Regions:
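Interfacial helix-cap and linker-helix signal at transmembrane-aqueous boundaries
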Residues: 38-39, 70-71, 157-162, 235-236, ...
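Conserved MFS/SLC helix-loop-helix module at the cytosolic interface between two early adjacent transmembrane helices
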Residues: 62-101
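Helix-to-loop junctions at the C-terminal end of transmembrane segments
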Residues: 63-76, 260-272, 356-357
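Structural signature of the two symmetry-related core transmembrane helices
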Residues: 78-92, 275-290
Length: 385
């Protein structure tokens, strides 16, 4: 594993695209830590917050089919650079908006920028893997988690110092904006071939093994959505942690997610995809029980970290498996998997918002335990390619 990571960090193009992943995670980690600020600013109840949080994934879902058109028109490299720059500015807008409606609109815009950058940077990774014979996808996704951890931890520290939220987000956004153009030359050196053939890359209704994989993906992505948007609220309102630690629940989650992704390439050949998924579901279930039954700062960070480790290998395994299903049009499995993954990530926060409003956040967030058991059971039965 160490040799694989050394090769990644000493290869300029891998390292440059890795910084794009880190930056996206860094911005996202900062945002999720400031969600309690948004809730307090507009005096929202949990159900209202859940609806507001639909805005960003709605923007991503809307933009997803157009992202490919943008990349085909302007190229993956320019789309990555300008997408990263636009995303940096967009992430500062929700906290800066004076009204709930402008906040919702700015979250939609942020989601659109995120979707475009996400497709572009993953296309860059695929190009590096194809033309330079390097396996960097799992590590690159791990870099996103590292960025999320650092962003959440830094934001928590700044909150503890009573730094105004607007100053915080604009300073971070400016840093990422400048970084986008600092790595421009290296990103532009990635080999890019013209490819406008999108045959087979359209959504199909899942059946057979793909249906089972989609069900597992829904469980995992609902869990990820819950952790992204509600972990800081849980730490503040239920655990009642010191303000310095508001983002540390998500930071712990992101840290062990990154660790899981960094070691995932060695775990899957040794234990098999199905066993890794089963263990991940069980680990996520145990993790949320630790956080719920022992609602203290350090036990909650530990529990959330276990959830991060549990979900870490889900996306790389399921996306790879969907792409390898025999007798299926090229790209069809991936397109379908991506559609349902976004839907799950979108649905999770809203579901928790309404459940929390009715039964309390502790009971609502315990839904993760059921999701973990569900995907562990399915993973033991579904064929993974």
């Amino acid at each position: 594993m160490l040799s694989h990571l050394k090769a990644y960090f000493t290869h300029p193009r891998s390292w440059a695209v890795g910084l794009v992943f880190v930056s996206m995670g860094f911005l996202f980690g900062n945002w999720v830590t400031l969600i309690p600020y948004i809730k307090a600013k507009f005096d929202l109840n949990d159900a209202q917050l859940g609806v507001l949080l639909l805005s960003m994934p709605f923007g991503s879902t809307f933009m997803n089919p157009f992202a490919t058109l943008i990349i085909n028109r302007f190229g993956m490299r320019h789309s990555t650079i300008w997408g990263m720059a636009a995303m940096a500015i967009a992430y500062a807008l929700p906290v800066s908006s004076p009204s709930i409606w402008l906040t919702s609109f700015s979250l939609v815009v942020t989601g659109m920028c995120l979707a475009t950058t996400n497709v572009a940077m993953n296309t860059c990774v695929t190009a590096i893997e194809k033309h330079e014979s390097r396996n960097i996808m799992s590590t690159s996704h791990g870099m996103f988690s590292v960025g999320g951890m650092v962003g959440a931890a830094l934001s928590s520290f700044l909150i503890g110092l009573k730094t105004p939220a607007i100053i915080q987000v604009w300073a971070i956004s400016l840093f990422v904006f400048v970084l986008a153009f600092a790595i421009q030359k290296t990103i532009l050196s990635i080999y890019e071939e013209k490819n406008t053939d999108n045959n087979g890359s359209k959504f199909i209704w899942p059946t057979g093994p793909l249906l089972g994989m989609v069900a597992i993906s829904l469980c995992i992505n609902i869990t990820e959505g819950i952790m992204a948007d509600w972990s800081a609220i849980y730490v503040r309102d239920i655990v009642k942690a010191n303000s310095f630690f508001i983002g540390w629940g998500f930071a712990g989650y992101a840290l062990l997610m990154a660790t899981g992704r960094f070691v995932g390439d060695s775990l899957v050949p040794r234990f098999g995809s199905s066993r890794v998924l089963v263990f991940g579901g069980i680990l996520a279930t145990v993790g949320i029980l630790v956080a719920v039954l022992l609602p203290y700062t350090y036990t909650t960070i530990l529990g959330f970290g276990m959830i991060g480790a549990g979900v870490s290998c889900g996306a790389p395994i399921l996306y790879g498996s969907a792409a390898r299903i025999p007798n299926m049009a090229k790209g069809a499995g991936l397109a379908t998997m991506n559609t349902f993954s976004i839907a799950g990530f979108l649905a999770g926060p809203a579901i928790i918002g309404f459940l929390s409003n009715a039964f309390g956040l502790t009971i609502a967030i315990s839904l993760i335990a059921l999701l973990g058991l569900c995907w562990a059971t399915l993973a033991a039965k579904v064929k993974i390619y």
